[in-house]
Amino acid sequence: MNTYSLYDQYIERLKQIRSLSSPSLSGIGEASEYNKRLRDNFIRIGQLAAENRAILDEFLFPLLNSDKGLTEEEASEIDSFEEKLVTAENAENLDLPIAEIVSERLLHDSLKKGQLLPRLRWMDASISVCYALMNMTSRLDEYPEIAGHYRQKGLELGELFISLREKENFRRLESAEARELVLTNARFAVAFYENLTGDRDANIKNLEMLRASMEIAEDPFYTELMPDFDWRYYRYRLLDYFAHLTDICNLRGMEGDQLTEICERSEEMWDLWHSDSEYFSGLEKESYVEQLLARNRYYAKRMTPEAYRDKLLEIYHNRDKSLYDVCGVVENIQVPIELFGLCGEIRLSEADKMLIYTLDYNVLAYVFHMPNSSALSVMLEHSAHFFRHFIEFPGGTRFERLMLRFLAATHPPTYVHSRMVARIATCLCGYLIDRSPELLIGVEGCSAAEEVLQKRDLILWFVWHAALCHDTGKILIMDTIFVYGRKLLDMEFGLIRTHPKVGASLLMRFPSTAKYADIALGHHKWYDNSRGYPEEFDTSTSPVKTVIDLVQCADCLDAATDTVGRSYNRGKGFDDFCAEVREGSGTRYAPWLSDLLSEPEVREDIGFLLTKGREKEYYDTYQQLKSIHDKEMQ
């Protein structure tokens, strides 16, 4: 059987699955059509997923796990597969975890065979995968060790390429391909210092590596050995690396003479781009280079904050609102982040507030209109910074609203799930207040059951919004949430387990949502804390322990019974879920939940929410998405 064809089918199904999970509104005239489209799409996703799992289970995994060495044909097939999973050209990664295990097997085989050129090829593939995984996991500030793992692997591979670039070793390389791989990846190694914050030693090392690579381009030893190598591109990309050392509001903490050097290199990049704009415009737009130059002039104190702001606004107003590649993401998401950073330094005027409000809307509209197959990875990377630099102010957009609209724009089923959990938890809480108000002591400052009854509406409001925010952390791992085509790997389960802590951290950044952080942090913990995650959080120490238990139950109930957004799986019935609660009473679930869910009034209300209520949520989601779809970006 032609496994090339099978792997190509896997790729095409992945693309279909991603598109089906967040369908376009084109051709949908009514909310009922949207609901049907989603249901049909997820049935189709289930079929596509089964076909992809068969390819992995019957062909790829047995090959990767075999003790036998790969044949030349097998290595070629999975090498081609890995390249298609990581498509750097359009900043899109279709399945990084699978690409990682494929590249590791290829590298392992090449080391055993001792052949240098195949080894270099697969080191090249492996370093690209490491970089993509580092960027993917660098969004998770609360878990630096995850990105650190891939950073270290990438740096070790980079050091191997750098050692081969030394003149004595480089001369021994027998082919132009081997030499090109060494030059390219020794240069690329500096990229593994990205996303480090305030590490002065790393900043010094990064600059030293860049200077060394620049010297290579001016050394006749290398240029004469490689006369056909694109030295112009090599030099341009190095200048690009220099210019990005102050990326995202200079998070790396470059300072003093470093900033001066970076600025001067940015000016070189600007001049080089304009020396042959026809050639370089095929790499990046002029505005991309202009934004880098303006930022580095500002940090080198060669441009005032006001002048930098004006330049950013000029670039933003002239942006291409429908450009969905790296340059488009820079113009439409990164430039607003830099403007947010400036607003933190300059007094927030009414004009600033209006600007921030407009930027918030435009970024969400841009994300909503982004095709599912374009630049998802780079969009999520910049969106993570957007959320962490977001500014709240009275009368402006609240973080909760921003987060929910982002979920709606990128993955409607997760948005509907958040609202369903809020409806279920609030419904259960209302009945709990009536029957056992003492369980809510501690919520909204209540010190007695009588106060709980008096503050009934305030407590329900709290539960509603806390539940809406329970999955906040998922906004930074949407590419893992998109994985429907196969079972999650251990690495992906690890990423999923980060979302409570990441969500709590994001919520704590903003006054309007800080009080919901414990619910986000604890909603995957068992009632008795014997299982669940994060392990270090003991929910019994939280004053909102009962709300955590309500949301945990509501979360499990919606996930178990949803047959629209999760129709690729068979949903449980409400009675089956209640039996599960009885079985786990006092361990997984709060002991009072079993009795509460057994009451006829509660069962009737919850049953309504799981049927008509869920349909209404999809109707409302359609209306919200349609309003974004129909309104032009400003």
Regions found by a protein language model. Give the residues of each.
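Helix-turn-helix repeat elements of alpha-solenoid scaffolds
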Residues: 7, 23-58, 85-110, 141-168, ...
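An active-site-proximal "capping" alpha-helix that borders the catalytic cofactor pocket
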Residues: 419-430, 492-508, 573-593
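Amphipathic alpha-helical repeat scaffolds of TPR domains
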Residues: 6-22, 28-90, 115-141, 171-196, ...
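Acidic/His-rich, divalent-metal-binding segments that scaffold phosphate/diphosphate chemistry
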Residues: 361-494, 537
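Intrinsically disordered, glycine/charged-rich C-terminal tails and inter-domain linkers
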Residues: 9, 13-29, 44, 350-362, ...
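Short, charged, surface-exposed loops that flank catalytic or proteolytic processing sites
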Residues: 487-488, 565-575
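Extended, non-transmembrane interaction/recognition domains
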Residues: 267-283, 287, 294, 298-378
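Histidine/acidic-rich helix-loop-helix segments that form or flank divalent-metal centers
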Residues: 171-180, 228-232, 441-467, 507-553, ...
